[in-house]
Amino acid sequence: MSSEHIQNKLALLPDQPGCYLMKDRQGTIIYVGKAKILKNRVRSYFSGTHDSKTQRLVQEIVDFEYIVTSSNVEALLLEINLIKKHDPRFNIRLKDDKTYPFIKITNERHPRLIITRQVKKDKGKYFGPYPNVYAANEVKRILDRLYPLRKCSTLPNKVCLYYHLGQCLAPCVFDVEASKYKEMQDEIVAFLNGGYKTVKNDLMKKMQEAAENMEFEKAGEFRDQINAIETTMEKQKMTMNDFVDRDVFGYAIDKGWMCVQVFFIRQGKLIERDVSQFPFYNDADEDFLTFIGQFYQKANHIPPQEIYLPNDVDSEAVQAVVPDTKIIVPQRGNKKDLVKLAYKNAKIALNEKFMLLERNEERTVGAVERLGEAMGIPTPSRVEAFDNSNIHGTDPVSAMVTFLDGKPSKNDYRKYKIKTVEGPDDYATMREVIRRRYWRVLKEGLPMPDLILIDGGKGQIDSAKDVLTNELGLDIPVAGLAKDDKHRTSQLLFGDPLEIVPLERNSQEFYLLQRMQDEVHRFAITFHRQLRSKTGFQSILDGIPGVGPGRKKKLLKHFGSMKKLKEASIEEIKEAGVPLNVAEEVHKHITAFNEKAKNTEQK
């Protein structure tokens, strides 16, 4: 769609709140946003300068739609639904839910107490989230001892062990009034909302009474229940003393990114936090609102009794998203400190993100730039490294790995079976591989490397340079990586005549060379082992009547390794798809081979 068409639509935008939907060339909705004034917000995308991520979004926009709403709150609610419906790729994408465990009282005629990670709208009562299953199980274990709800998922025909332990009312056999269940459910709710202290006091009285009546076994049971309550419910440091469930939000922004931290406070305890980081395209407070809206659309994020927000957030809009929750913007005291703490953690997380990015760039792009400077060549953004592998000249192979801006590009890795060289001739092997690789690069117009690294010394380097210059007419820098007596990277050889490039052993550019040399060596060795395994497998099967190339291939595919074939019975060999008489011949041949190998070892 033409730029003129966009400009005409921009001129018609209203001064009202609403949502806008950006579309790409295929008509796919790639971004949904909301605005207090549509005209100002949408026009801002097509005027002025933007950071790189916003520019990427704008470059893909070829059309847009908008929906006018009566208020900013209504726009927020609509935006949440539109994002949920279209899942635009440029919008905030919350990480996959880390599903926390909840304790649930099921909505059944005979309710159960269970632990679940799935929160559904099924009229069950949910308590949590808990930081892990262990914590949830600890609490459930106490509740099971105090409140004898049924344990079986389906009712049996007779009472079970839990009835004899006093932990089930046995509704499978006895009638249990609904009022009894309601009484227990109310007590569980009170217990989990901080009323466990009352329960503990009641148990202490019962323990004393039982002891006075010489009922020591019963007193011991009460004592164990009291200990369980103390160790499970009181071992965490209290953050608030009113047992109210709260979510505390804080966010920080930097370099076009936002980090939101949510503290989950349950029963007065800070039990867990959620951290989300994402690029934002609107005003920070607007995108933060969008985040909250999406956050509580997730099945495992149940709105608590209270939500604490920073000062600059439209609390009225949040209230519309979670109408049954009290929205608070704390101004002072402990509550304000919690919001500040969430902000501080968000800021630290963002700083850490960018520091890690800088460190990663230092060891990749930065290392490549300094390597080029040390060698006196343009920055070698694309490096192709070669290594040969053989054992006494058998099954010779070579391998090439590619690094782009200091990072391995595995799609550009290549393996080579050596075709023209017999015996252990490393120089001839290098000539063949360089010839095959760069003849194809020339023929197919593939990207040329800025630097070729050879795992070897002067002979290998000269062989590679001779092919490049005199056969292919290419002028590509070639350097060699020499190793010490412990097979570790020790020197970079480059120039004409060859000289050692002075590099600090603890520099990032030296570490980069080590990674390249280790990677190409690993790749070559792995390929050589695979080839040896395959050829070794086939050679053992040579000369067996009825086993030609096709059946060798079938046996290799079925068993995967010689070791497994050696251990196979005749019946198992037959299962590979060969006739019984052939399976018997294979088994006989391999048994004889194993015996011969065993006798050789003993001698």
UniProtKB/Swiss-Prot annotation:
Its main location: cytoplasm. One of its GO terms (molecular function) is DNA binding. One of its GO terms (biological process) is SOS response. InterPro entries: DisA/LigA_HHH (IPR041663), GIY-YIG_endonuc (IPR000305), GIY-YIG_endonuc_sf (IPR035901), GIY-YIG_UvrC_Cho (IPR047296), RuvA_2-like (IPR010994), UVR_dom (IPR001943), UVR_dom_sf (IPR036876), UvrABC_protein_C (IPR050066). It holds the Pfam family UvrC_RNaseH. GO terms for cellular component: cytoplasm; excinuclease repair complex. Interacts with UvrB in an incision complex. The UvrABC repair system catalyzes the recognition and processing of DNA lesions. UvrC both incises the 5' and 3' sides of the lesion. The N-terminal half is responsible for the 3' incision and the C-terminal half is responsible for the 5' incision. This is UvrABC system protein C. It comes from Listeria monocytogenes serovar 1/2a (strain ATCC BAA-679 / EGD-e).
